[in-house]
Amino acid sequence: MNIIEQLEREEIARLAKTIPDFEPGDTVIVNVRVKEGERTRVQAYEGVCIARNGGGLNESFTVRKISYGEGVERVFPVHSPMIDSIKVVRRGKVRRAKLYYLRDRRGKSARIVERNDRPAKAEKAPAAAE
């Protein structure tokens, strides 16, 4: 293990965020801290995870939802301090790692079949630094 990987593992352990095991195709609720003036509040953002990018500290994921008839995508860093929590609502059965084709689909063709083979796992704690 090189020094960079070791530093990233130590930083992830220091952050001590519980991140559920989710994949593209899963419907997730991301609770995001939003600052409005002087106060902060938590806003829920529910949608389909269409991609996961990167690894380690720089890992991010893209969530797509339809809001008032318009498609809205938002990219979240997994280890961002602005993310309060992530909850997996349902598991989706897909055969691709990147679901960008959903951008061109509307209605029934944009549906994702629910996966029944395994339930949503309990949240996993980050691996301890060795």
Swiss-Prot record:
Disulfide bridge positions per record: none
Sorted UniProt keywords: Ribonucleoprotein, Ribosomal protein
A Pfam family this chain is assigned to: Ribosomal_L19
Keyword field contains Ribosomal protein: yes
Listed GO CC annotations: cytosolic large ribosomal subunit
GO BP terms in the entry: translation
Domain of life where this protein originates: Bacteria
Any GO MF annotation of the entry: structural constituent of ribosome
HAMAP family the UniProt entry points to: Ribosomal_bL19
Purpose of the protein: This protein is located at the 30S-50S ribosomal subunit interface and may play a role in the structure and function of the aminoacyl-tRNA binding site.
Family as reported in the entry's similarity comment: Belongs to the bacterial ribosomal protein bL19 family.
Name of the molecule in the record: Large ribosomal subunit protein bL19
Organism this protein belongs to: Methylorubrum populi (strain ATCC BAA-705 / NCIMB 13946 / BJ001)
